[in-house]
């Protein structure tokens, strides 16, 4: 198992949920957390615990990004007009690593981050190696010509376990996608329930 898979499944085990809806997730085979005491009944979480869990789950979904970066994203969402939770989801889904993952050019969010780091991605014709690059409506994201035959890409576009969301137009023949709009929370196809309102409550304490 690769390091990316180990990290991904570690997050699943920690949360006790199959966050990305992957068939091989270890939580598909058991209904308790990791460790020798995993089968013990868990006590009821406090309000703080529920809010913390919601934050950790959302943060984990986007590749377990750092707390500093996640909080910075939240603070930007809070400064914007409108609902902070909606703004937070829109900002997270606008990240380049999220768009590459949602377009099904790579199998996991972790692979997306590595793919970008290694310089395999163009945005509007220019190489971009910043995972957190904020895509804008109309941005064209493309796998660089020399990278289109990588096994990682070829295997990913054949996956049928998840669909490309409506706010991304993906052409898998050309390995190109257009980020058409910033999505609302209701538009985002999470495999498990996400609760951005609880994340807002966590940071508002």
Curated annotation (Swiss-Prot):
One of its GO terms (biological process) is translation. Keywords: Ribonucleoprotein, Ribosomal protein, RNA-binding, rRNA-binding. One of its GO terms (cellular component) is small ribosomal subunit. PANTHER family: 30S 40S RIBOSOMAL PROTEIN, SMALL RIBOSOMAL SUBUNIT PROTEIN US4M. The lineage of its organism: Bacteria, Pseudomonadati, Pseudomonadota, Alphaproteobacteria, Hyphomicrobiales. Residues 1-46 are annotated as: Disordered. It comes from the Bacteria. Belongs to the universal ribosomal protein uS4 family. Coiled coil: none annotated. Part of the 30S ribosomal subunit. Contacts protein S5. The interaction surface between S4 and S5 is involved in control of translational fidelity. This is Small ribosomal subunit protein uS4. One of the primary rRNA binding proteins, it binds directly to 16S rRNA where it nucleates assembly of the body of the 30S subunit.
